[in-house]
Regions:
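Short, hydrophobic/aromatic alpha-helical segments in well-folded domains
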Residues: 4, 114, 169-173
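Secondary-structure capping and boundary motifs in well-ordered enzyme cores
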Residues: 8-13, 42, 60-75, 100-108, ...
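Catalytic adenosine-cofactor/nucleotide-binding cores of aminoacyl-tRNA synthetases and other
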Residues: 1-99, 202-204, 210-211
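Core structural elements
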Residues: 74-82, 129-141
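Short alpha-helical "patches" and their helix-cap loops
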Residues: 35-43, 59, 90-105, 150-153, ...
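Residue-level signal for cytosolic alpha-helical hairpin/rod architecture
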Residues: 2, 108-113
Length: 240
């Protein structure tokens, strides 16, 4: 029988489950929910009297329920950490002073409008897919720009400005799916939730939002994160 909610929460975080379910597109097609933690089918037959190896115990088997978690930890979390650690090192713990490139602003506006249209049609699966595609592209942009800017403070500030603009957009759009992690990012960026997650401010970058709140980029203090901080934490049962 299907696991109860209480049982699921013994192996997965609410954020992981919500992101997975929203991505399945259950309103469009029939998809099975197959969390590895509850899969008791045989992965490998035991030999010489040894017990069979079940899927739930086989480290070689990828957990379908954690597919979206790879995006949260490998793309989204990395982007947030890159921005905050980068600003701590290069901007004195404040926002970058550069204006984002127009192509960065255009890309953000495009995904915002696409997401809003899809959400209006209750197409959560496609809306999250649009954010995923956008976030991966912006993460790649940041990786290339930050690498090219090594040793050039002005170019690095510009790369950070682009990344911060994208980070705000990603965090706003992912908030309905993973609110806890997104609100933790807003806290680290030192913005009130009611302003940061307001759709009235959706087309504002962090620098513009700070200005609305009466601060310049140089005045807006960011949180100093400890090393290797995770905004999207794994369930204790998933840690090696």
């Amino acid at each position: 029988k299907p696991p109860m909610a209480k049982e699921l929460l013994e192996f997965y975080t609410p954020e992981q489950l919500r992101a997975h379910w929203l991505s399945l597109g259950l309103d469009q097609r029939a998809v099975s929910f197959s969390p590895k933690a509850f899969d008791t089918s045989v992965s490998r037959k035991g030999k010489d009297g040894e017990p069979d190896l079940l899927v739930k115990d086989d480290p070689r088997v990828v957990d379908p329920a954690l597919k979206e978690s790879a995006f949260l930890t490998n793309i989204f979390n990395r982007m947030a950490r890159s921005c905050l650690y980068g600003a701590a090192n290069a901007c004195g713990g404040h926002l970058p002073i550069s204006e984002p490139h127009q192509e960065v602003i255009d890309a953000a506006q495009e995904v915002l409008l696409k997401y809003e249209q899809l959400a209006y049609g209750f197409d959560a699966h496609s809306a999250l897919a649009a954010v995923d595609e956008y976030a991966r592209a912006e993460n790649k942009r940041w990786g290339e720009a930050s690498k090219a800017a090594q040793g050039n403070d002005e170019a690095y500030d510009q790369a950070l400005a682009d990344a911060f603009y994208a980070l705000k957009t990603i965090t706003l759009l992912m908030h309905p799916a993973v609110p806890e992690g997104c609100e933790r990012i807003a806290d680290a960026l030192n913005f009130p939730h009611e302003e940061f997650f307001s759709w009235e401010n959706a087309f504002m970058g962090p620098k513009e939002l700070a200005a609305k709140l009466g601060q310049s980029a140089e005045e807006h203090q960011l949180e100093e994160l400890p090393p290797r901080f995770d905004f999207f934490k794994a369930h204790p049962s998933q840690k090696n």
